[in-house]
Amino acid sequence: MASHIVGYPRMGPKRELKFALESFWDGKSSAEDLEKVATDLRASIWKQMADAGIKYIPSNTFSYYDQVLDTTAMLGAVPERYSWTGGEIGFSTYFSMARGNATVPAMEMTKWFDTNYHFIVPELGPNTKFSYSSHKAVNEYKEAKALGVDTVPVLVGPVSYLLLSKPAKGVEKSFALLSLLSSILPVYKEVIAELKAAGATWIQFDEPTLVLDLDSHQLAAFSAAYTELESALSGLNVLIETYFADIPAESYKTLTSLNSVTAYGFDLIRGSKTLDLVKSAGFPSGKYLFAGVVDGRNIWADDLAASLTTLESLEAIVGKDKLVVSTSCSLMHTAVDLVNETKLDSEIKSWLAFAAQKVVEVNALAKALAGQKDEAYFAANTAAQASRRSSPRVTNEEVQKAAAALRGSDHRRATNVSARLDAQQKKLNLPVLPTTTIGSFPQTVELRRVRREYKAKKISEDEYVSAIKEEISKVVKIQEELDIDVLVHGEPERNDMVEYFGEQLSGFAFTANGWVQSYGSRCVKPPIIYGDVSRPNAMTVFWSKMAQSMTSRPMKGMLTGPVTILNWSFVRNDQPRFETCYQIALAIKKEVEDLEAGGIQVIQIDEAALREGLPLRKAEHAFYLDWAVHSFRITNCGVQDTTQIHTHMCYSNFNDIIHSIINMDADVITIENSRSDEKLLSVFREGVKYGAGIGPGVYDIHSPRIPSTEEIADRINKMLAVLDTNILWVNPDCGLKTRKYTEVKPALTNMVLAAKLIRTQLASAK
């Protein structure tokens, strides 16, 4: 019985690759230094899998930045602006595409399906020239072979590559990207020929787009591609790997009818219906099924007994020698190694498995199927599963009851938004086009040091409070000097918008090294939600009241919304996600009520990640949006009409969910918009009726560039062409945490001047 891993984290157990990349980018180390770190990491990963007994070990899943960018390099599809002149693509061109350089911007980055990983989007057009320009896949196969490890080289499949691309600048938006299939397949043939010559016997094509809603034309491209590659692939075993959702019946039919393909990989965690499909539609005889039963996207130990039952039922259909135990997707979406968690509570730790432990689980399942079950290992797993089910720290009866009582009500505020805005205006007395910022202010080295020392107990609580108070006072003073209308306290006490709340809620645990790659060298460390969520004490009220006492202007209370906390955490898998979300919503609701009681009249509840949780298939959108929007309304349904509820959203493409956003029933919504002005405004141009306050970002905080007053005024005027004067707010598009004060002050100065300029124009037009 064989075992397989779809892919493995690249960063290293202690983020070795991150630090090597950043050192290289800063000019502090050489290309050779970076390559050495990468070579050592690859070798240790291959050795680890070989030692664990994995039969099908992947190669070419390592990347210096992103696997889709690696494919762009392999195909030589470098956009013209990078002035690449041919030959093997080196670090200079590769990292310019990923990060931009002094003279040209980076390629666009977008989310990889519904994960928190981001890929670099290929820019293609009818004139794109393709040539074999990066031999990485072959080099890494040979590198592993020299170490005595025979691997399965992994390539992003040709059809998914094109479906994930976008038309380059200047190319018609309607350009048919799939028309380039015949242009890229010759390069794939060259790569396949080299891999064969190097001794490869298996090859894995990742074609995750097969789980999306595809039309017949798109499905036909898979048949065309793998028919065209058939002779090149002869003599090789070919695995097509899918992940992140069920495979639709039509896609399954197309996939299983491909002659050149020997094996199919399915995600049986997110794809709970795929098992039924294999049973009902049948499975082609003589082909392999790679069964993704170990979750590649979470940190929970596998329920080995349950997985074994699934595998045994598949074995009856596929045959003993054709079933391979695998992960549901690449393990790059989970943390690296539990061994490095020395401070984690031992009971909670017994419920977890990171990437290194999941490799062992896959092999243990394969051996059990082959009649070599490790009884002690399985018994320990059964005990851990039982402890998790019965542990008193997981269940809080009071929370369960409160969450159950939410059903049957839609938790709307009693008065409609226009009446509320009138009541709020009487109390707040804001000018037309009120100015505000999104929440965070620059976090200086000194500020980070204070937080670090307080956490390490090197300074007293009094010293810490005094330092944070001083910072808040500075931020309030700056905003008053700039004449901003609705102030923020700058969030100096917060390291991260999710972790800060998770640390104060029960049901959350935190790791020391549970890092997961987000993009390039950037990693995130998601909290773990292991049990029922509740709020033992107020979390932000102390700081918000302190800040409000420093000014007569309205001070915003700042909270992270329940959907964002959920989508940016590793979530418990023993109850539906929406139940956990409702529990978080109830905890945030208590905080909102305490802020209101403490005299805070404007409360912002950020839902940066609301859209991120949208399922991959349209049929599932309505259910998700229904409970996500409901969770938001739960947080603030009990406040008075005079309390103004803001929310902030961090993505540009939400035209398709505008009605759900309206349904959130916030008083004011601020949106990251500056990079995609037209996209957002087109929604309102198309006649969507929107009556609440709205603040589309007037400048991009992700860039150090300081926008001029004229430029911001021009943006505001564009917005006023489609939005009513009395609902428009003026604000940056995101928090200012990552910027320097030397950038923030002039940018905000110009923003306030622009708002005043337009106010004067509007007044004189009357």
UniProtKB/Swiss-Prot annotation:
Record: residues binding L-homocysteine: 438-440, 491, 606
Organism annotation: Oryza sativa subsp. japonica (Rice)
Subcellular location per the Swiss-Prot or TrEMBL entry: Cytoplasm, Cytosol
Keywords of the record: Amino-acid biosynthesis, Cytoplasm, Metal-binding, Methionine biosynthesis, Methyltransferase, Transferase, Zinc
Main subcellular location of this protein, as a coarse class: cytoplasm
EC class of the enzyme, as a word: transferase
One BP term from GO: methionine biosynthetic process
Protein name: 5-methyltetrahydropteroyltriglutamate--homocysteine methyltransferase 2
Enzyme Commission number: 2.1.1.14
Residues involved in Zn(2+) 2 binding: 659
Pathway assignment: Amino-acid biosynthesis; L-methionine biosynthesis via de novo pathway; L-methionine from L-homocysteine (MetE route): step 1/1
CDD domains found in the cross-reference section: CIMS_C_terminal_like, CIMS_N_terminal_like
Chain positions recorded as L-methionine binding sites: 438-440, 491, 606
Role of this protein: Catalyzes the transfer of a methyl group from 5-methyltetrahydrofolate to homocysteine resulting in methionine formation.
Cofactor remark: Binds 2 Zn(2+) ions per subunit.
Family statement drawn from the similarity comment of this UniProt entry: Belongs to the vitamin-B12 independent methionine synthase family.
